[in-house]
Amino acid sequence: MSEFPRIFAHRGASSLAPENTIAAFAKAMEVGARWFEFDVDIAGDGSLIVIHDDTLDRTTTGSGSYYQLGFSDIRRLDAGRWFSDTYRFERIPEATDVLAFAHAQQMGANLEIKPCAGGDRLRERLIEALAVTLAG
C-alpha cells in the first residue's frame, strides 16, 4: 500500500454510494481507490458506529441523536435509501466491520474520530473503546 499517489475516497466513494457504508467502501475499491476515510462515533450502548453527523436525520431513515440508542436499534435503520433505491437496506456499520473490510481487501483506512456531541462521558468511552478495538 505504499504506491503513490495515494488517493483517499472520502467516506468511501460517497458520490457513487451512500457515505460511510460498506457499499461506499467497496465502490471506492471498484473505482481504483486503495485508501478510504471513515468517521467513527459512539452509540449509547458503547458501540463504535460509522457515521459523520451527530444525528441520524440526513443519512438514515431515523431521526435525532444516536447517543441514547443501542446498535441493535441503529442497525434496523436504512442508511442507503436516501441515496438511491439501489442501496435500500444498506446499514450503518460498526467500526470493526469497516476495519475487517479494509483488512480483507488490503485497503488502507483513515479513521476520523468525530467530536462526540454526546458529552465528555461518551467522548471518553469513544476513545477508550477505539484504543481497545485498534489494539485487538
What is the predicted function of each stretch?
Residues 1-136:
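Phosphate-group recognition and catalysis centered on beta-loop-alpha active-site segments
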